[in-house]
Amino acid sequence: MQIDLNADLGEGCGSDEALLDLVTSANIACGWHAGGANAMRDCVRWAVQKGVAIGAHPSFHDPENFGRKEMQLPASDIYAGVLYQLGALSAIAQAEGGRIAHVKPHGALYNQAARDPMIADAVVSAIRDFDPSLAVFGLANSVFVAAARHAGLAAVEEVFADRGYRADGSLVPRNQPGALIDDEDTMIARTLDMVRSRQVRAIGGEWVMLNAQTVCLHGDGPHALVFAKRIRAALEAVGVDVVAPGMLQADERA
C-alpha cells in the first residue's frame, strides 16, 4: 500500500525546509494569497535538493484573507489568474533545475472548484492549456477531480488529516463547529482509516467512502513539524510506503 504526503508551503510559516524532509509533494504558494518570488525560489530550491515533487498552489488574488474568502469571478478571470501563477512558479522551477509536477488550488479556490463545475472547468482548462502532463490534486470525490479526468488530466484524490468531513464528502467550513481537528492521536487514527480502509467518519457519525491518494499535512500550524513526523512514522509502521504520485502503482491510482 502506498500514499503521498503533501504540504502547502511558501506561506511564511517558517518550517518549510524541515517539512520537505517528511513530505513527498510540496504545494508552493504563488504569491497571490501568501509568499512571493523569494519564498517560491527558496521552496523550489529545497524541494529540488530533497527530491520532493514540486506543485503550484494558485489562489484567488486575496492576500488580505489568505485566499480563504470565496469570490464570484467570471471563468475568464479564474483561467487567466491560474495561468499567471503557473507561469511564475514554472519559471522559478526551471531556473532552479526543477519542474512543476502537479497543481493544487488553495483555500476558497480549492473549495469552490470542488463543488462548482464552472470554476472547476476554468481551473482545469488553465492547467491543461499550460501543460497537460501536470497532475491535479483535488478533494476526493469532488467535481474538480471529475472535471480534471474528463479533460484527460491525471487527478490525485486528496484527504485531510486535520479537517472534519460532512456526510457528502465535503469539508466542514472553517467557520463552523467540527471544521478543525486539533488532537494528534485523533488525526493519526483518522488518517490510517482513510488510507487503509478508504473511509472517514463524518461529523454526523456517517462513514464516508473516499479514495485517499494523497494526505495534506498543513504546514501553518504551531505543531506542523512534530505532527508530520508522527503521521509519517505511523503510516510506515503499518506498512504503508510514502511516495510521490508519480511513483504510485496503478492499483493505488484507481
UniProtKB/Swiss-Prot annotation:
Keywords: ATP-binding, Hydrolase, Nucleotide-binding. One of its GO terms (molecular function) is 5-oxoprolinase (ATP-hydrolyzing) activity. It catalyses: 5-oxo-L-proline + ATP + 2 H2O = L-glutamate + ADP + phosphate + H(+). Catalyzes the cleavage of 5-oxoproline to form L-glutamate coupled to the hydrolysis of ATP to ADP and inorganic phosphate. Coiled coil: none annotated. It is an enzyme of class 3 (hydrolase). One of its GO terms (biological process) is carbohydrate metabolic process. It comes from Burkholderia lata (strain ATCC 17760 / DSM 23089 / LMG 22485 / NCIMB 9086 / R18194 / 383). This is 5-oxoprolinase subunit A. The keyword Repressor does not apply.
